[in-house]
Every structure is written in C-alpha cells, then in structure tokens.
Design a protein with these regions (language model features):
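Sequence context surrounding c-type heme c attachment/ligation sites in exported
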Residues: 20-98, 766-921, 925-929, 935, ...
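Aromatic-lined, polymer-binding surfaces characteristic
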Residues: 435-438, 446, 476, 480-503, ...
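Extended, well-ordered alpha-helical scaffold/bundle regions in very large, multi-domain proteins
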Residues: 438, 442, 457, 461, ...
Length: 994
C-alpha cells in the first residue's frame, strides 16, 4: 500500500483549505523523481498517453491541474511506473504525496481524482487486500456528517405519507396494503430517479440541481392544492376547524349556483309569466343545416363536390355535450314536429342561457345531421317532460335575486353571475366578522402541518418564525391562500428532500459523535425500507432506547423479521401480485441492483429470433427472477453461494406450490376426460353434450358455434402436454393463477430455458432443478441484461464479473477506440470478438474481461443454453418458419451453425486452487462461489449500498466484521446487514472539511 493511497483512502474524505490560485511549482526533489522514473516516456521526446512532465512548471494553470490529477490517479492505482519497471520507494512516494497536496493548495483547487473516488464507478480503487488483511483495522471508522439527497423510492413513500395514499392489492385471496407504489390521483413528478445500470445506484454525493428544484416547485403547488381539499383537511383537525365555515359556504354557494343553472329558465317563466319574453335577449339563430349526404348515406358531400366518410352516431356524438342535447329534446319534443322546429327550440334555450357559441354550434351541428338516430336510440316520447313544481319557501331566495338583478336583454348566465357574486360577498363578510385567527390557533396549524409534511414537531424557534409568516400570509391572502402558501413553503424546505445525518452530543476521543436518536431512526428505517420510521422505532426514540449499539441491533433485527408489510418490487411489471414481496424491500433491492438483471427489459429483442412474443413475457421472466432471489434470501443460508450456484429456478410459476399443483391436476383431468373421445371430429352439437365439464373445468364458456375450431386446437395442445404420462404445465387452466388470483400468463418464458412443451415434465413444486444452469449468472434475465440486441456480449459479462465479484478495475475505453465488432457471417461472435480485441493495444484491458465472458458463450443472447451458434444471415438461412403460431411452437428460422467454444480463464481470486482455465460458465461460477475474494467483494458492495458511499481504509474493521458475521452465521445476509448497521462506520458521524 503506497503512502499516496493511504493519505487519500485512509482518511474518509480528503480535502483542503483553499488559498488564492497560484501556478504549480516543481522543486528539485520532485523533478529528480520525474527524471528518474517518468520522463523517458513522458518527457520532451516522448509523449505517451498525451502526458509530458519535463516542463510542467511552465504550463498554463488548467493544464497543470489536469496533469496533477493524472499523476495522482496513476500513483494511486499503481499503474505507473509499469509493473516491470523500477518502483518508487516509500520516501519518494511520500515526497510526491506531499507535493501534490501542496500544489492543490497553491492552485486553490480540490483534487478531481479524489472527487472521483467518491463515485460508484471508483469504489474498487481502494486496495482489496488492504481492506481485509487487518493491517488497517485499528483505524477508527465513521461516516462524515452529511446532508443526503433522498432517492426516488423514499420520495414516493414521502408523497404517499403526506397525501395519506394507501394502495392495496390482492395477495393470496386477501387485500394487503402495499408500499412503493406511485399510482395516485395526483400529478406529482419524481425528480430523484436513480441512474440505470448494475451496481449500487444511490450515493450520498448527488447534488440538488435546477431540474430537481423546478420539479419540486411544481410538486409543492400540486401538493398544497391537494391537501386543501375538504377530505384531506378533515384529517388535519386544526386546519379543518379554521376552514370549516368557509368550506360550508363553498358548498352552499355551489348548491345555489347549480340550482340556478338547472332551473333558471322555469323560475323566470314562473316569476314573469307572459312578460318573460319581453326580458329575453333577441334570439340570433346559427341557421345550421344538415350537410348533404350521398345516396347510399355513407358520405358527406362537401360544397366543392368532394366526398368524405360520414362517421357513425357513436363516433360523431360530442361526449361532453350529449347530455345537454338529450335534456333539451325531452323538454321540447312533441308529436308531428319537424326536426328543424325541435332544433330551433333547443338552440333558443341555450342562446338565452348564454351558452357559448362554440358549444351551441357543436350541439346543433350534431342534431341536424343525426336527429333521426338520436330520436331512435333514446326513444323520446311527447309529454315526457314534467315541469318542476317549486315550493315557495325553497325558491324565495332565488326569486329575490332574479328580481333584483335581471335587466332586459340579460342572458341567464349574467343573472346567475350577479346573484353568485352577491352571495359570495355576503359569505366573506360573515367570515370577516368573526375576527382574525388567534395565536394559539395558528400555532396548532403550524404544529399540524409540520407533522404532516415534515414528519416532526417544530421547535420553539420555528414556531415563532412561522407564526409571523402565517400572520403575514393570512392578513394579505386570506385563510385558504395563506394555508396553501404555507404548505408550499414547507414542501420546499430542504429537509423535505434531504436526509440529515449529523453527529450529535459529545464527541469521543477521535472526534466522532453518534447521531441523534431521531436522525438514527430515519437512517435505520431508510436502510431497510424506504419509509419513515415505524411506530416501534418511534417508541424507541421517545423512550430513550436508541442510543447504543445494542439498541440499533435490536431494532434492525426486528425490522428485518417483519413480514406484515408488502412492497411493490418494480412498477414496470404491472398489477400482478407476483410483483410483491414482504421481504424488507432494500434487502431484495440490493441484489437486484448488484446483479443488474432488472435492466434487461430495456434491451430490444426480436420476437422472431426468440420464437415467441418477447414483450408479452419479458416482465413475467423478471418477476420469476425476483421470486428466485427472494426465495434464496428468505432462506438466509449460504446466500451468496446459493445465488451463484443454485440449479433451481422458477419457470411459469406463481410461487404458490399448492395452487400450481391444483392447476396442473385440473389439466390432467381434462386430458383424462377427452383422451378416448373423437374430439377431432366433434361438431358444435357434439361439444354441447359435454358443456358442463367444458365450462366447469375452464376449457371454454361455450358461447357459440364459432368456438369449435378453438376447442379442437385447445384440445390438441392438451393432448400434446400430457404425452408420455408427464406432469402437464397448467397454461390456460382457470386454476393457473397469479398470487392476485388473476390468470397466470407467460407460458412462453419456457422458451428461454430450452424447454420443449411436448417433453416438459412440469414441476409443480418450485424452484426446481434445471439442467445446464447454475445461479443468477445463468438465468436468462441476467444473461440478457448483459447482451446486445442481437448477440451476446462477453465483454460486458466479463467486466461485470471482474468489477462486482473480483473487486477489480477496468480502465475507461480510450476516446480514440471505436469499439465495434466487425461483421462476418461465416464466424461465431466469439471468433469475431477475438479478432478485434486480442491485438496488443486492446488486450491490455480486454484480458481482464474476455476470458471471463467467453465462458458464457454456452448461452445465446436470450439466455438459452446452446452447443452451436446460429450464423444469422440471409446467406446462411436453411429453413424459413412461420412468423406467427401458438404459444407452444418454436417459430425461429433455421440457419447454418458453428460449434460454440466455451472455455475461458479465471484470474483474480488470488487463490491458486481456483484461478486457471475453466470449461464453461458452470465451471466458472462454481469456482467463484468458493472464492474468499468474491464473498468479500459482495460485502464491499453491500457496504456501499447500506452506507451510501465508497469504503475507505478506516472502514477496514467494519468490512472484516461483516465478512466474519456472514461466515459465523452460516451465510446469513441478515447477519451482514446487522453487522454493517451496527458498525462504527454507520453509527458514528464526524465533521470533515469540504
């Protein structure tokens, strides 16, 4: 471990107090090191890597800064000097380390390389052996004080909590509340979406930007509007109390306005009698006529003679205006009346009411062209309209207003507006007469809204600050607008979108402090699920029982054991309850992010090449991969090894073994019933003799003769699936249900696993063993996630193994490299990749990836096992198959093939018994699962996931303890979580300079 690496990685966050910007100086001691080790390749004559060090002091400041970063990075990752050259001594490294630090100070800059070390892509840069050797275990772990931006999942739960949104789903015959669903009747934008890709995605170094802010301004307005509706206010007693009278006034005003709109025509007739017509505005008709139609009635004839198709009644009907048309026709329809007369009476009423010209035009236009159809469909009758009879007491108020405000020529809407305005003014005066809100009332409101929006009580200073603010809002805006504004203010506070994790109280001898119990409660809750602390955790805070490491452990273990909460795993999957889990969601999500398999649905795949409908079944495949991971982590034994090597999978299975057995048995009964009948030649009448069984067993509803061919095809599939006495898959059985009790679709996922339906002995108990597969890395979901649209990708697969399992690093692709594999339809993809990557310039990096990825060539880009690769090119086509068929048919075209070569090489476990040539992917994953380095690499990623940052040398003891917890517990991932969340790295916070 070099001194430069210790100076950066041994301190949690390395930064400087900046001074005025000056240029770099190079003392003789540093120049001597450059001349001894560097300038032969990076001097005046040579410029390898576009880097020269002989004249750095005379360069522009920007160039100097870039060179400093390059030097620092190369020394840290020990790439320079090259491994086969003389290496720097500890003293020389110390000189360079001190020089680099001093130069950053002179320039008034922080190291860009150190900033990179905090990002997810650079987590592996800290030397693995240094972390786990015990050499640095005495360094005291902590996490810097931090203000941590929330992620998309926490945001969703926050909004659901603020809005009292509770989603429910069916799960095994009962309704359960679910978390993590953003389905709500509210126009909220989630601005905190995490990046895609495999690996830990949520780090504490994401900064609030303009996009976040703009979205939150819009969200604040939407939330304030939503919380100020009566239903939401009723759940906030102090708010509801001060708004009750205004809400009552609003309802009364709405009632009166609605009554006038519905009845003003009749009221005016009753008030004015024969004189009513003298007050009406002069009627100006639109005089619309029906558009001429062709003799066959199917087309309109336009003025220029062109014909356009006439829409049918249902298409042409103006949906928003149709109710007004029907209401008016009921009122004016009489026997022997012409359509023109009826239209005119309706139009006149709308005109007098003050209905807009566009609306009248829409209504009249539809009536003149479709009157006969309107009358026929609605079966209007003369005398159907019964004038309303009003009680004098009920209409006294309205009559007074009409008499007071109506002027000759007024449209009805004008009279209504004048009346409503007067009532509105009266209500406002009534409320104003009650006086201003008292201070205690406002304080109650402040407390209530703080609790609702920020999930805490305000302190005394905040109460006084917001009391003045609320009083100002109320005096200038009124109660409703003041409350709306105050809600927006709280939503836009930084604590709504940030997690605050700062040390509190007295520091220990190392300058570290524990978090406050309140902050710790949120840190623990967000580590295990995405919600605010549950009631038990809040009680622990209130009762002073979240102050010690043992307190943390007790609460963590309790939360990990909870199974009464259900979480939506992935909103893309749809509404099936199979997409739910009652495993604490962040426990499952770690492995989803670590393996990266949920990314595969974003990769386009061709249906024809799969031989089935890819888009219809891809999310079923994702669900079943989630089921497998959930199953393994719920067992919580040898979790890493099982995830890497288990040969058991779910294939077309809900996870309910008992229910799936019943479904398969149902198929067997259908087979037994029909196997000896001449169903191939049945007529509809023949099938009707067996109607009771057909309907009861779910084969068909028997709704007509058109089902004969469908029945025969279904029975043909039934016979095929019951061949040779094997257990049939339960597809199309009414008992083949998801956990939501809906039909279980997606039988075609069997194509991914090389299953032939006429040979499939369906395992009703799953997960079940499958040949030629071991673990998640041979699950089609993972294999497709690390593939391209039309071919495999050994580079991506090898890179993932190198970085995620072997704690290795891969340099970035140089910008001068065009990473394209040449086309050659006579060669396998591996052969083409070897041609382009195994040249000297490329092999330096590709040797770290390709030999690992080559082992997975035993699977194609859909994750199907293979021994030969189809050379998919028109010149190699042997047989063209149909583009469409049943779920059971393999529709792939047949091409010439070449044998696939699956041998590879494992290097990087640092174990001679494991490193070496491998036969294929199964051999590779077996070796990986036995590797100490692989186990520790997964734990490093778990550290990043639960801490929200990269590990540094002061976290060495935390990582060693987590590794030992896994081993001593028999491979429990819960034990790893408990160890991490009770470590010094999690418990302690410390202020560091930024």
């Amino acid at each position: 471990m070099n001194i430069l690496k210790l100076s950066i990685a041994g301190l949690s966050i390395f930064s400087f107090t900046l001074t005025a910007g000056q240029k770099v100086t190079v003392p003789a001691s540093v120049q001597g090191i450059f001349e001894k080790y560097c300038t032969d390749c990076h001097g005046a004559k040579k410029k390898k890597g576009d880097l020269q060090l002989h004249d750095i002091a005379n360069l522009e400041k920007d160039f100097q800064s870039n060179i400093l970063n390059k030097i620092e990075e190369q020394l840290f990752i020990e790439e320079m000097p090259p491994k086969d050259e003389e290496q720097l001594s500890e003293n020389e490294l110390s000189i360079l380390s001190e020089w680099i630090e001093n130069q950053y100070k002179r320039m008034g800059e922080n190291s860009k390389f150190q900033a990179k070390l905090k990002t997810p892509d650079f987590g592996n840069y800290v030397n693995h052996e240094d972390l786990f050797s015990g050499k640095y275990k005495d360094l005291k772990g902590f996490t810097p004080d931090r203000r941590w931006l929330i992620n998309e999942f926490i945001f969703t739960e926050k909004i659901n909590q603020v809005t009292n949104t509770r989603q429910q789903r069916n799960r095994d015959g009962k309704r359960v509340n679910i978390h993590n669903s953003s389905k709500r009747n509210l126009n909220i934008t989630n601005p905190f979406l995490l990046p895609s890709g495999s690996g830990v995605r949520y780090y504490d170094n994401t900064m609030l930007n303009g996009g976040h802010l703009l979205s939150m301004i819009s969200n604040a307005k939407e939330l304030s509007k939503y919380l100020m509706n009566e239903r939401q206010m009723s759940s906030m007693a102090p708010v509801y109390k001060v708004m009750k009278l205004e809400l009552d006034h609003d309802k009364e005003l709405e009632k009166r306005q609605r009554f006038l709109h519905e009845n003003i025509h009749e009221l005016m007739q009753e008030i004015y009698g024969e004189k009513n017509k003298d007050y009406l505005p002069e009627f100006i008709s639109l005089n619309m006529e029906a558009t001429p139609v062709s003799p066959d009635g199917n087309s309109y004839i336009l003025p220029d003679g062109r014909k356009v198709k006439k829409s049918n009644h249902d298409v042409a009907a103006p949906k928003g205006e149709y109710p007004y048309i029907k209401t008016a026709i009921v009122k004016y329809y009489v026997k022997d009346q012409t359509s023109a007369e009826l239209v005119r009476l309706c139009e006149k009423e709308w005109y007098e009411k003050g209905t807009g010209k566009l609306k009248i035009s829409t209504r009249v236009g539809f009536m003149v062209n479709y009157m006969s159809e309107i009358l026929r469909r609605n079966k209007f009758k003369p005398g159907q309209f019964k004038p309303k009879v009003f009680k004098e007491d009920d209409i006294k108020l309205y009559k007074e207003m009409i008499l007071k405000h109506r002027q000759k020529g007024d449209f009805h809407n004008a009279v209504i507006k004048k009346s409503v305005d007067e009532w509105q003014a009266g209500f406002e005066a009534e409320r104003k007469a009650l006086g201003e809100l008292k201070e205690p009332e406002i304080i109650e409101i402040i407390n209530c809204l703080f609790q609702r929006i920020l999930d805490r009580e305000p302190n005394d200073g905040e109460i006084q600050e917001h009391l003045s603010l609320m009083q100002s809002y109320i005096s200038t805006l009124g109660r409703r607008e003041a409350l709306t504004k105050f809600i927006e203010t709280l939503v836009l506070r930084s604590e709504f979108v940030y997690r605050y994790e700062f040390g509190d109280g007295k520091a220990d001898e190392h300058g570290r402090k524990m978090m406050s119990p309140e902050a710790a409660a949120y840190a623990l809750a967000y580590a295990i699920n995405d919600s605010a602390p549950d009631e038990e955790l809040r009680k622990a805070v209130k009762n002073g029982k979240l102050n010690t490491r043992e307190d943390y452990k007790r609460e963590i273990e309790r939360m990990l054991k909870r199974r009464d909460l259900y979480y939506l795993i992935d909103e893309r999957v749809g509404q099936n309850a199979d997409g739910l889990t009652n495993t604490p969601i962040r426990k499952l999500r770690f492995f989803r992010e670590f393996f990266g398999y949920p990314n595969f649905p974003e990769i386009f795949k061709d249906n024809k090449r799969l031989g089935a409908s890819y888009d219809r079944i891809k999310f079923r495949l994702l669900e079943e991969c989630d089921q497998l991971v959930d199953y393994i982590i719920s067992k919580d034994k040898n979790v890493f090894e099982e995830l890497l090597t288990s040969d058991r999978y779910y294939v077309y299975h809900s996870g309910d073994n008992e229910q799936m057995k019943k479904a398969s048995d149902d198929i067997k009964k259908q087979y037994e019933y029909f196997k000896d009948l001449d169903w191939q030649n049945f007529t509809y009448e023949d099938f009707m003799k067996h109607k009771d069984f057909i309907v009861e067993s779910g084969i068909s509803h028997m709704r007509g003769k058109g089902e004969v061919k469908w029945l025969q095809r279904s029975l043909g599939e039934l016979m095929m699936r019951n061949k040779n006495g094997k257990t049939p898959d339960p597809f199309k059985s009414k008992l083949a249900q998801s956990r939501a009790k809906t039909r279980l679709d997606g039988i075609s996922i069997a194509h991914f696993f090389n299953i032939k339906f006429d040979e499939w002995d369906y395992p009703v108990t799953q997960p079940a063993a499958l040949p030629n597969r071991k673990g998640i890395l041979s699950h089609p979901a993972w294999l497709m996630a690390f593939s391209q649209n039309t071919h495999t990708d050994p580079v991506l697969r090898g890179k993932w193994i190198r970085e995620k399992l072997l704690a290795g690093t891969i340099p970035d692709v140089p910008i001068t490299v065009e990473a394209v594999v040449p086309e050659d339809h006579h060669k396998t993809f591996r052969a083409r990749l070897e041609d382009v990557t195994e040249v000297k310039y490329c092999w330096k990096c590709h040797k770290l990836m390709n030999p690992l990825g080559y082992a997975f060539e035993m699977f194609d880009d859909f994750g199907r096992y293979r021994t030969e690769e189809a050379l998919e090119h028109p010149d190699n086509l042997l047989k063209k198959n149909p583009d469409k068929g049943t779920e059971y048919e393999d529709l792939r075209d047949i091409f010439k093939t070449q044998p696939v070569i699956t041998n590879g090489h494992l290097k990087g476990t640092e174990d001679d018994k494991l490193d070496g040539d491998v036969k294929n992917a199964l051999d590779l994953v077996e070796r990986l699962a036995k590797s100490e380095r692989v186990r520790q690499s997964i734990i490093r990623h778990a550290f990043r996931y639960f801490m929200g940052r990269n590990e540094v040398l002061s976290d060495s003891k935390t990582l060693i303890d987590a590794d030992q917890a896994y081993l001593k517990s028999g491979g429990s991932f819960d034990a790893v979580i408990v160890s991490l969340l009770t470590s010094d790295s999690f418990i302690y916070r410390k202020a560091v300079k930024e």
